[in-house]
Curated annotation (Swiss-Prot):
PANTHER family: RIBONUCLEASE P PROTEIN SUBUNIT P21 (PTHR14742:SF0), RIBONUCLEASE P SUBUNIT P21 (PTHR14742). Optimum temperature is 70 degrees Celsius. The gene is rnp4. It is found in: Cytoplasm. It holds the Pfam family Rpr2. Belongs to the eukaryotic/archaeal RNase P protein component 4 family. It catalyses: Endonucleolytic cleavage of RNA, removing 5'-extranucleotides from tRNA precursor. This is Ribonuclease P protein component 4. One of its GO terms (molecular function) is zinc ion binding.
């Protein structure tokens, strides 16, 4: 009985590991293709999101901010995305998708705090 439970746990972990590898591969392909074929890059992102939902895994942090949450376009700063730093209230990065106009805000307070600690 214990062996069956261990095997199930191992299978779940293995499936999640494979899913994360595939997601990473799809995002890497999207990054390569995005400049000359944005539609194909968008399809790669959509496939990665489908895998993520099916396998119930999180998208790796390095890819999470590289696509538009609304239209699933792979974002390239200066081409189809505008990136701005804002310091009012709480310091944050503003990424605007130039395809659909969606605005994403990400705080960077943690980085500012680390910088202050190093300065003192």
């Amino acid at each position: 009985m214990v062996d069956i439970v261990k095997r199930r746990d191992w299978e779940k972990k293995e499936k999640k590991k494979i899913a994360i590898e595939r997601i990473d591969t799809l995002f890497t392909l999207a990054e390569r293709v995005a400049r000359y074929s944005p539609d194909l890059a968008k399809r790669y992102v959509e496939l990665a999101l489908e895998i993520q939902k099916k396998a119930k895994v999180k998208i790796p942090r390095k890819w999470k901010r590289r696509y538009c949450k609304r239209c699933h376009t792979f974002l390239i700063p200066g081409v189809n995305a505008r990136v701005r730093l804002r310091t009012k209230r709480m310091p944050h990065v503003v990424i605007t998708c130039l395809e659909c106009g969606y605005i994403m805000r990400y705080p960077y307070l943690r980085e500012v705090k680390q910088k202050r600690k190093k300065a003192t």
